[in-house]
Amino acid sequence: MSQTTTETIIPLDSSVKDKLDPEYVNFYNKYVCSNLPIVKTHTYPVDFLRNNGNVMPGQSELLPVESTEDITIPRKHTKAPSGVPSRIFRPHGTAPEGGWPCFLWFHGGGWVLGNINTENSFATHMCEQAKCVVVNVDYRLAPEDPFPACIDDGWEALLYCYENADTLGINPNKIAVGGSSAGGNIAAVLSHKVAASPANFPPLVLQLLVVPVCDNTANAKTHKSWELFENTPQLPAAKMMWYRRHYLPNEKDWSNPEASPFFYPDSSFKNVCPALICAAGCDVLSSEAIAYNEKLTKAGVESTIKIYEGCPHPVMAMDAVLEKGRILNKDATNALLAAFA
């Protein structure tokens, strides 16, 4: 039976403590371990987790942008009873000739948690630092809407950007996709889908995959990080499996390329856009990120992987307290600027 009471935060597991960045360890011990209740995601009901928010501190403040607009993207290409809520951030300044570059972003949360507000800090930083319109997609979540609902929502959002570039004030030749964790999974899938689309859309200029889920069949036998970081903080293996089973209740879907982009055929990899993959060194997902980068590179795709050693899964969302979180932010900015040039 799922627990509904909070527990005392436990110390960092001995199997991983010495591998973690000292800056993270100090922050965890000072501000997390002693002051906050633990929320063991895989032992709590989904509604409890959604209503109690993200207890992990460390995210930087939002950057001021020129404007923020919430819209609902009408559903045109897939089947569902409603459109796709999204938030549009526009940067300060004068748009370049042809329109602003566009960055389509998908938040993390294991396809179960998170929402349009979860990663606004990162979205506003990319908007201002990379001078692009950011479309933050509030895709449907499992278990209410399991696979492939979020993929359909992401596809609607991407095609909306292509088909309504003039209205949005963006350049359809300068569109990038990205996401963190489960959102990185969605972005990777969309990179394959648009490359294979018969609609002849301009190619994406970048896929920015931050601590992405690339292989939903992964386990300790197939991916070393699942063994090494079974008890890593914030995304232990049991927690990842909790997410997977909510999103993919039918195990036969685990190897579907739209759930595990690692399993797209080699012919599909040859056509996808360049990539920057940001992996956390102490993340259960790090091995599959490395394997995905190798597959992209083998296919001739310009792909770079950066590994933030000693960092746990949420390094991107800890840029206010971790130097390596700030470095990741800068790496992402530079990759977008180069792709949009």
Curated annotation (Swiss-Prot):
Signal peptide (residue range): none
UniProt-annotated location(s): Cytoplasm; Nucleus
One GO cellular component, as annotated: cytosol
Main location: cytoplasm
Assigned keywords, A-Z: Cytoplasm, Hydrolase, Nucleus
Molecular function per GO: hydrolase activity
EC number annotated for this UniProt entry: 3.-.-.-
Superkingdom of this protein's organism: Eukaryota
Cited Gene3D superfamilies: alpha/beta hydrolase (3.40.50.1820)
InterPro entries, per the entry: AB_hydrolase_3, AB_hydrolase_fold, GDXG_lipolytic_enzyme
Disulphide connectivity of cysteines: none
Top EC category: hydrolase
Family: Belongs to the AB hydrolase superfamily.
Protein name (database record): AB hydrolase superfamily protein C1039.03
Lineage, uppermost ranks: Eukaryota, Fungi, Dikarya, Ascomycota, Taphrinomycotina
